Amino acid sequence: MAKIIISLILLLSLFSFSYGAYNCNKLNCSSKNTKCRTFSCTSVVGCYYTDKCTSPDLCHNSACNASTGNCTLTTISCNDNNPCTDDFCHPGYGCYSVPNSCDPGVICQQNCNDNDPCTYDFCDALNICRHSETYCNDGDACTLNTCGVNGCNFTKISCDDNDPCTADYCSTLYGCYHEPIECSIKVPCNIDSDCNRNNGCETFTCNLSTNTCDYYAKNCGGWPCINNQCTTGSISN
């Protein structure tokens, strides 16, 4: 029990030493006073200062003139330079913005037309001109979409593959496709595999009597064959 009491006495002594260590008379904190700051002292923290000019809330800034000690209070600007927001200040929270109903293109103060028919010109919410590439797409896989001096151009593409054993078509959805038709090509062949052209849409045989490869359309159950495989739906040309 005696050991516990002695330990408590030592602990209290250390506490008193740690938190009562500053001698305010010796520190003479008031000698550090300026026209904008007043210094004080406690035995716990020593010297500390208080600013003469302080902001009353989060919507104002306070500044002190070091020469005169006069305080100047200014209002904080909450303008985010976005014409499509209304900007406010709450004394306890500071700046905040609320979206409004506006058309940045109407608010824009400058002409953003770059006279390029292949760009879409607009003014953003920060009053800055932007030019994005014109998206020329008619949704038709059978046309080549380009942009020129007159704007968007849509040119029909050729699906001719120069293969006498295919009929060439174009689907607005898939683009070009080539359906095998019955035909014969005079090429040397000894077995059927000699006629293999790696076309998944055709079948073939080797006619040994004529040394020709005979080709036929693959049976897809009435569905078209596109990109070397049977489709599961109809094709609109």
Curated annotation (Swiss-Prot):
Coiled coil: none annotated. GO terms for biological process: slug development involved in sorocarp development; socially cooperative development. The gene is pdiA. Residues 1-20 form the signal peptide. GO terms for cellular component: extracellular matrix; extracellular region. This is Cyclic nucleotide phosphodiesterase inhibitor. Glycans are attached at N28, N65, N70, N153, N207. Cys-rich CT repeats lie at residues 57-81, 82-105, 116-139, 140-162, 163-186. GO terms for molecular function: enzyme inhibitor activity. Pfam families: Dicty_CTDC. Induction: By starvation. Repressed by cAMP.
